[in-house]
């Protein structure tokens, strides 16, 4: 019953008009009035911001802020996979041969997430990682590895929240929400970077348009907190053992190691 009521409330409030109004407000100078309160409530680290709080003219500018030069370092080990974002490490695990994985008691289909069987087949038997970005986090997304961009595509229309309630009661938000996917071929092995939209504010702006990408290079930004899902081919990586659910991650921090193949 709670799941049904939750979904009904989301469907009634999560329409195009609501999203449009919220987006317009966030991009308006009027939104600057609540910037100080927003920064206080979400405990934004102002020491890391590229500009002072009063220099951000709208909430949108604050959401998409850049960091000061040198505030993040990218792990330089050739075999490392790095966190593409600042965020909270939610979960990782195996992708079953049936191209599904379980998180928070909910089963997700890679076929649904990527839009078709052919794309999903690459990741059967592989590994998934999920990182959640709260409204307080730096919202820009960087590449976790170097390689050639093979595909960029967008799927989904509406978005359920990706917080605890959304994960429990929503309609598989990681694979059904509005999402932007970038696939990268790195030394013959594939990785999918799935950028999942948040409720009301679906906007995910792509910044990278070249055919190649370097580890740590900026690729996109969210206009609000959301979630990133990483998919890796079978036997491609080994997740850093020290990683724990709920752990804070910083952009550029090593999260996995590429496995050597003879």
From Swiss-Prot:
Cofactor note: Binds 1 pyruvoyl group covalently per subunit.
A cellular component term, taken from the record's GO annotations: plasma membrane
Broad class of the protein's primary localization: membrane
Bilayer disposition of the protein: Peripheral membrane protein
Annotated localization: Cell membrane
InterPro entries named among the record's database cross-references: PS_Dcarbxylase, PSD-B, PSD_type1_pro
Keywords carried by this UniProt record: Cell membrane, Decarboxylase, Lipid biosynthesis, Lipid metabolism, Lyase, Membrane, Phospholipid biosynthesis, Phospholipid metabolism, Pyruvate, Zymogen
Name of the featured protein: Phosphatidylserine decarboxylase proenzyme
Organism annotation: Bacillus thuringiensis (strain Al Hakam)
Origin organism lineage: Bacteria, Bacillati, Bacillota, Bacilli, Bacillales
Gene name as annotated: psd
């Amino acid at each position: 019953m709670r799941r049904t009521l939750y979904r009904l409330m989301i469907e009634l409030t999560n329409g195009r008009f609501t999203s449009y109004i919220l987006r317009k407000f966030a991009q308006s100078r009027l939104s600057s009035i609540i910037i100080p309160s927003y920064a206080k409530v979400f405990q934004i680290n102002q020491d890391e911001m590229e500009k002072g709080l009063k220099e951000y003219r709208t909430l949108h500018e604050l959401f998409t802020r850049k960091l000061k030069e040198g505030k993040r370092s990218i792990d330089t080990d050739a075999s490392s996979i790095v966190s593409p974002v600042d965020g909270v490490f939610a979960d990782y695990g195996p992708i079953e041969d049936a191209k599904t994985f379980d998180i928070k008691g909910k089963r997700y289909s890679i076929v649904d997430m990527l839009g078709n069987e052919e794309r999903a087949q690459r990741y059967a038997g592989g590994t998934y990682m999920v990182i959640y970005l709260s409204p307080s986090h730096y919202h820009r997304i960087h590449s976790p590895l170097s390689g050639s961009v093979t595909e960029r595509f967008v799927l989904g229309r509406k978005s359920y929240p990706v917080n605890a309630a959304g994960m429990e009661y929503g309609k598989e938000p990681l694979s059904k929400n509005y999402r932007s996917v970038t696939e990268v071929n790195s030394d013959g092995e594939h990785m999918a970077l799935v950028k999942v939209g948040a409720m009301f504010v679906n906007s995910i702006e792509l910044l990278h348009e070249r055919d190649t990408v370097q580890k740590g290079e900026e690729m996109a930004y969210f206009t609000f907190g959301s979630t990133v899902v990483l998919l890796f081919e079978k036997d491609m990586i080994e997740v850093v053992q020290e990683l724990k659910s709920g752990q804070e991650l910083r952009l550029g921090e090593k999260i996995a190691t590429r496995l050597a193949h003879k």
